[in-house]
């Protein structure tokens, strides 16, 4: 049985870890691909074996969480639209509040990714979220 200390992160895991730190510290625009690969201990060529741009790397770090929270919102919105008008009026506050609470819980459970989206994404497709 392998000891936890014997398990080494994969190249992709090292790239993701280094990129997350770099983006959180400097934002997307200030982040250096050179620093990311150096911190990850890989070559630029190895990086380009996985991603063809810094933006694709950023997207890989946050797209799952972004899509999930948008799906939560759209699903709640669609369910609300299916209610009869009087039920919409009677339940608007509760439905909206419940959705917001679930979204905030999800954001806290994925704090680094949402810090990237909300505070470090200038220059990416997420900057106006």
Language-model features and meaning:
Residues 1-8:
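N-terminal intrinsically disordered/low-complexity leader segments
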Residues 83-129:
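Short secondary-structure transition hinges
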Residues 31, 56-60, 116, 124:
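Alpha-helical transmembrane segments and their helix-entry boundary regions
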Residues 29-30, 50:
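Flexible coil/turn residues that form the inter-helical turn or adjacent wing/linker of helix-turn-helix
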Residues 26-29, 110:
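Short coil/turn segments at alpha/beta junctions that flank glycine-rich nucleotide-binding fingerprints
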Residues 10, 14-21, 25, 35, ...:
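Alpha-helical structural segments
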Residues 42-51:
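Short hydrophobic/aromatic patch on the recognition helix
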Residues 2, 27-28, 78-81, 85, ...:
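Short, flexible helix-adjacent loops and helix caps
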């Amino acid at each position: 049985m392998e000891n936890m200390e014997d398990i080494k992160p994969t190249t992709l895991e090292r790239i993701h870890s280094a990129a997350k730190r770099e983006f959180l510290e400097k934002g997307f625009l200030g982040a250096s691909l050179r620093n990311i690969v150096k911190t990850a201990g890989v070559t630029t060529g190895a990086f380009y074996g996985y991603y063809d741009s810094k933006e694709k790397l950023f997207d890989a770090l946050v797209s799952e969480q972004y899509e999930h929270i948008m799906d939560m919102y759209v699903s709640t919105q669609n369910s609300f639209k299916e209610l009869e008008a009087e039920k919409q009026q009677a339940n608007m506050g509760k439905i909206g509040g419940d959705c917001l609470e679930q979204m905030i819980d999800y954001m806290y459970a994925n704090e680094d990714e949402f810090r990237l989206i909300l505070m470090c994404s200038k220059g990416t497709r997420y900057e106006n979220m």
